[in-house]
Structure formats: C-alpha cells, structure tokens
Amino acid sequence: MPKSGQPAQNTYFCNMNTSNAEIITHQWFAGKWKPRPADGHKGTFGHLLLIAGHEGMIGAAVLAARSALRSGVGKVTVHIPRCGRDVLQVAVPEAVLQVDESSESCWSSLIDLTGFTAVAVGPGLGTDGETAFALRTLLKALLERETAGTPLPLILDADALNLLATDYQLLSLVPPHSLLTPHLGEMRRLCRALDLPCEELADLQVAARMLSDSLQLNLLLKDHIPHLFIPEGRLLVAEGGGNSALAKAGSGDVLTGLIGGLAAQGYLPEEAAGLGVCLHREAGKIAEARHSAPATVASDLVDAVGQAFLHLLPPH
C-alpha cells in the first residue's frame, strides 16, 4: 500500500505504451528553438537561480553554473554556501554569487525570488537538516506564487530529489508543471519512499508515469535513453542509443544547468528538458570524438555545448 495520501496501488499498474512517444531528434530541436533577437540584452534572455553546492561537492555547482551559462541564458545567480565562494568566483567569473547567510557548508537560508525567471535546485546540494528545511520553505514560496498566478519554473535534481525521498510529503509542495530529473538510483529512492515497485526498469517507468499524471509534474527519467514523462500521458524519448562518454560523475549536473538555463529563457519545462537532453547528448558525441569515451569528463561536455548548438541549429 502506498504512503497515506498517495494514489492507490491499482492506479499505477498499467502497460507502458511508447508507440505514440515523441522522439527527440535534431529536427525536433530545431523546431522548438526560438530565434534570438539580435537587439536583445541580458534581461531578454532570462535569469536563472541555481541552488547548488555543499562542502566537498562545490564542483557540481561549478559544472551546473558553467553549462547554464552556455545554454543562452542572460544571467545566472548561484546560491552557494560560504565554503564555495572563492571556488565559484574563480571557476565561473560570469556567474553572480549569492552566498548563504547562515552556513559555511550547506544551503540553509531563505532566498528572495524577486527577479528570477527559473529556479534549479540540487547539484551537489547535500541532505543536511538545514537544507531540508530550506527546501521546504522554497517549495512553499513557489507554490504560493503558482496559486497567485506568478509561477516560476522549477527544476529539481540530485540531492533535492533525495530530500523528497527522505520526506515524501514534500512532494505535495512541489508546484504543478515542475520538472524532476532523477537518474535510476534517485528514482528508486523515490519509489521506495512511496512504497512503489522499483526493481526493474519497467517498474520505474510505470512509477514515473503515475507520478507525472497524478501530481501534474514533468519527470525526466535519466538512463542511457532518457524518457520524459509529461502529464496527460505524453512521453518524449531521446533518439538513438546510449553513449558511455556521458556515464561520468558531473554529467547530470551539466544537464541540470542546461535545462535550468533554457527554462529561464522562457521555454516550458518539458521543452527545456527535451532541448537540454538533445544538447547534452550531442555534446557527449562531440566530447567523445575529441577525447574518447573513457577519457571524457563532465567539463568536456560543457566545453562542447557551443559546437553542439552549431550541429543542431540550421545555419542562418
């Protein structure tokens, strides 16, 4: 029996049907991409708030911030614990730093959301008690904005998802149409918290479909072939097979930065996820060609994003 307040067990056992899935191709990417006005300024292209980093995991914040800036977003502010200030300032000079007021090592303080056009939370965040409280407070603030008709797109990844699994009732605070981006391990933790079957990949896909439809959330299940579950039964699937060049620590942080930056530019969360997946996979191919699959690291993916855009977008 699922946890109290969650859908009954017989509502999520169903046959996964991918025959009507949309395929994320180069053509799909080009069709979704919006031309950038030549007279635009940084305000035209959005402002991402990235909440990331913990003592010992500041590199995740660096990777996510660098990739977000490569996505085309006008401005990125990184909320970081004090221990990461100097690292971020040097590694990502283009980012604006918002240093946590209360903690040396983790996210613990409240954040003013004024001026941001999207929020991404999770890379290298840690799961401290102070961070769990800060996440709850943020979700409540975003849910209030949703109710008031001034929603902010939200992307939850990595330790933000692990915190949801630790306290499954936080799921009820996640605003509709937000995007969750679990890899298979994170998805299993969420499933176990909700008493959902999770042993096989098919179990995880069924659970993703159930969560997407019942909570009106977008859910990107990250595997060698990513599946994007969208409410009302929609499904997007990445074209082609896997690429082991992407199977490296930090790869998911790069994807989160890309998706967050795209959402901040005004793309719907599901559009940002599809575009981000396509860019990420293309960057993986480019990095593999440059470095080989074994030698590719997450920073190589960030460095390949510009070339990925050139491959994916038709010449002017």
Stretches found by the model and what they are:
Residues K3, T11-L154, N162-L179, L184-H316:
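Small-residue (G/A/S/T)-rich helix-start motifs and N-terminal tracts that mark the onset
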